[in-house]
């Protein structure tokens, strides 16, 4: 049941009604961010993710993602740090930041591979 809810939550963020095609296309392409440490990232990360460690996310995000309406999916090892990242991003205006859990859960539910460097 938990995986069904996560899948529904993730894909519900993909449905957008917008007049501006650019705005719609941005929202249709969520950005996946891994907020774990560099060592954890190097041990394996989701294939489409970008890496911004939790301790740097508040100071780095605006240089990476300008549009504060962009859908952002956050993950870590268990979902704890990605939950903290969601709170931090929402506090600076990223209204569509979503904690989607831990790396194994995300990989399984989104059918994405874990790559090792």
Where are these regions (language model features)?
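Phosphate-rich cofactor/ligand-interacting catalytic cores and adjacent structured alpha/beta frameworks
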Residues: 34
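Rhodanese-like catalytic fold shared by cysteine-dependent sulfurtransferases
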Residues: 2-4, 16-30, 38-70, 80-117
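Hydrophobic helical h-region of N-terminal Sec-dependent signal peptides
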Residues: 6-10
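Short, surface-exposed ligand- or partner-binding patches at beta-edge/loop junctions that are enriched
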Residues: 75
């Amino acid at each position: 049941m938990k995986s069904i809810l996560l899948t529904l939550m993730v894909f519900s963020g993909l449905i957008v009604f917008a007049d501006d095609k650019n705005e719609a296309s941005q929202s249709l392409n969520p950005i996946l961010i891994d907020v774990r440490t560099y060592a954890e990232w190097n041990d394996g990360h989701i294939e489409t993710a970008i890496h911004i460690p939790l301790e740097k996310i508040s100071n780095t995000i605006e240089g990476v993602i300008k549009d504060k309406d962009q859908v952002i999916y956050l993950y870590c090892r268990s979902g704890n740090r990605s939950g903290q990242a969601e709170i931090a991003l929402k506090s600076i205006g990223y209204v569509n930041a979503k904690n989607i859990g831990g790396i194994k859960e995300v990989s399984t539910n989104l059918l994405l591979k874990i790559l090792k460097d």
